[in-house]
Amino acid sequence: MDSTHATKSCLLILLVALLCAGRAQGLQCYECYGVPIETSCPAVTCRASDGFCIAQNIELIEDSQRRKLKTRQCLSFCPAGVPIKDPNIRERTSCCSEDLCNAAVPTAGSTWTMAGVLLFSLSSVILQTLL
């Protein structure tokens, strides 16, 4: 084995270790349940089985009045897209899998999603270059 091949192998191992290191201590998410929209939610470390941070905003219409509430939590699955059939409830749910990514329900493409796609693309190019 020549030194170039050994260097490439070490770089590959380092890249894999860096990509895996972030999950060693568990995902961190904000957590609160049914609180007013303006309320701050504390950060928690999720259980190892929880792979998603959930952000849910709910608007309740009761007696011509609107109440806006939010829930932030860790879950093992993404409930986005599950319809609520009550016409007096409007709900928006988003799921993400980066630390503290559920501060708000995104209105467009997530910055973290775009960063993840970019990182994956870049690591693929680096990997092909090394091999």
From Swiss-Prot:
Lipid-binding residues (covalent, GPI-anchor amidated glycine): 109
Domain of life: Eukaryota
Cellular compartments annotated: Cell membrane
This protein's record includes keyword Cell membrane: yes
Annotated keywords: Cell membrane, Disulfide bond, Glycoprotein, GPI-anchor, Lipoprotein, Membrane, Signal
CDD domains assigned: TFP_LU_ECD_Ly6A_like (cd23541)
Keyword Signal in annotation: yes
Signal peptide positions on this chain: 1-26
Stored Pfam families: UPAR_LY6
GO cellular component: cell surface; plasma membrane; side of membrane
Disulfide pattern: 29-53, 32-41, 46-74, 78-95, 96-101
Bilayer topology term: Lipid-anchor; GPI-anchor
Gene3D superfamilies: CD59 (2.10.60.10)
All copies of domain UPAR/Ly6, residue ranges: 27-116
Stored SMART domains: LU (SM00134)
Propeptide residue intervals: 110-131
Principal location listed in the UniProt entry: membrane
PANTHER family assigned to the protein according to its UniProt record, in alphabetical order: LYMPHOCYTE ANTIGEN 6H, LYMPHOCYTE ANTIGEN 6S
Name of this chain's protein: Lymphocyte antigen 6C2
